[in-house]
């Protein structure tokens, strides 16, 4: 029909943010006529690369919830299933909304000044790529390097190594933005340091890790660690 299907959402979170269990609350609302079981499936799929792909400080909490509610007032199609075109369009919109909310949580991270995207590509599996991405994203040394605007790819290598994944170090290539700093495990020569320094001043930084070991990938999102994060959490006092 011509009736408009709407999806709206709100989210709360700034510290103790990590996948699967965080100090995070998100509520999503829609008027689409989709049953609860299918909505649950769609939300789980949307959360995999959004709410479960972010970390502020890698710490967890029990106050973690993402919920979706529907008034079921607007018909979305005849055969309500994952194969229905209306449901597929709805899923695309839901994924965009969840990713937008998840990124806003990271931007609002305690003391955060920079938004950091970690892309792990050409991995042997999605689970391996995810493990490596979060190992780098959760590293205090990586996060403080970003805060200090230092393209320290050695710290990225450290983060990859401590993931525990079996990889060939001679195949690893690393980029900060468009700038290649390491290729096939060795430093890139004749780097334009001035351009890289200018890039590191940006509010949003992308680190690409190419494992050259497969065809799978994973992208996660985090922020830098600043003095403000220390001040916020050092000043916090338990009331008990």
Q: What would you call each of these model-derived segments?
A:
Residues 1-240:
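A structural signal for small-residue-enriched, beta-sheet-centric alpha/beta enzyme cores
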């Amino acid at each position: 029909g011509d009736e408009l299907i709407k999806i709206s959402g709100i989210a709360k979170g700034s510290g103790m943010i990590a996948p699967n269990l965080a100090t995070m609350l998100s509520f999503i609302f829609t008027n689409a006529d989709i049953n609860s079981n299918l909505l649950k499936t769609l939300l789980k799929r949307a959360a995999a690369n959004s709410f479960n792909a972010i970390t502020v400080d890698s710490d967890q909490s029990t106050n973690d919830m993402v919920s979706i509610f529907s008034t079921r007032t607007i018909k979305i199609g005849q055969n309500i299933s994952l194969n229905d075109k209306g449901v597929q369009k709805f899923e695309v919109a839901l994924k965009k909304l969840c990713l937008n909310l998840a990124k806003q949580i990271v931007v609002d991270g305690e003391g955060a000044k920079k938004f950091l995207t970690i892309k792990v590509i050409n991995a042997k599996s999605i689970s391996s790529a995810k493990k490596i991405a979060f190992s780098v994203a959760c590293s205090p040394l990586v996060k403080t390097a970003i805060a200090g605007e230092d393209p320290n790819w050695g710290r990225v290598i450290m983060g990859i190594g401590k993931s525990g994944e079996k990889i060939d170090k001679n195949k690893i290539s690393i980029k900060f933005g468009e700038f290649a700093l390491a290729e096939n495990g060795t430093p890139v020569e004749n780097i334009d340091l001035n351009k890289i320094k200018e890039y590191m001043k940006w509010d949003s930084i992308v680190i690409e890790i190419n494992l050259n070991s497969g065809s799978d990938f994973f992208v996660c999102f985090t922020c830098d660690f600043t003095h403000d994060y220390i001040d916020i959490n050092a000043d916090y006092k338990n009331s008990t």
